[in-house]
Amino acid sequence: MTMNNQRDFNKENKDNLERKYAYHFDYDVIHPLIMRSFKPFFKDGNVLELGSFEGKFTIHLQECFADITCIEASSDAVRKAKDVVSNGVEFIEGAFETVQLKRRFDNIIMTHVLEHVENPNIVLSKIRTEWLAKGGRLFLACPNANADSRRIAVKMGKITHN
């Protein structure tokens, strides 16, 4: 695969037992921890969430921001997200590499997303040159494949890869 438009994002996001464990751990443990870490550094203004998936982290963002835009490549995930978040959140369906935005953002958030992007350099460049407002902040969280919690989950058979 050379370009995002050849990927089937809906197929990639289909639930299986392995992902259900990972998602519930993210929703119940990791998301609140990330919010506690990020929140003191949020700037007033708007926020762009890259890779909103089914809106579970977006719900936390609604506690801090009135102006939220989310980009998600999976149409199935966007549909589910619209069911769980309150009105006022703008969803844009598309791959980060190809989406064009008409404005800049004071806060940009990527939680457990960058590791799924085909070309992270392109996305990070777009964030810096096109999407992040002057003085804006990028909040980024990537999972650690060697973390004890992940290795324990592999040993328990909850996930099959490290």
Regions found by a protein language model. Give the residues of each.
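A short local structural element in Rossmann-fold oxidoreductases
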Residues: K82, E118, A153
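Short catalytic micro-motifs in class I SAM-dependent methyltransferases
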Residues: H112-H116
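Long, acidic, serine/threonine- and proline-rich low-complexity intrinsically disordered regions
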Residues: Y23, H161-N162
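Conserved N-terminal segment of class I S-adenosyl-L-methionine
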Residues: M1-R103, N107-T111, N121-L124, L140
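Conserved class I S-adenosyl-L-methionine
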Residues: F139-H161
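Short glycine- and Lys/Arg-enriched binding-loop motifs that mark or flank ligand-binding interfaces
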Residues: V47, L132, A153
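A short glycine-rich, Lys/Arg-flanked "PGG" loop and its adjoining helix->strand segment in the class I
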Residues: N121-R137
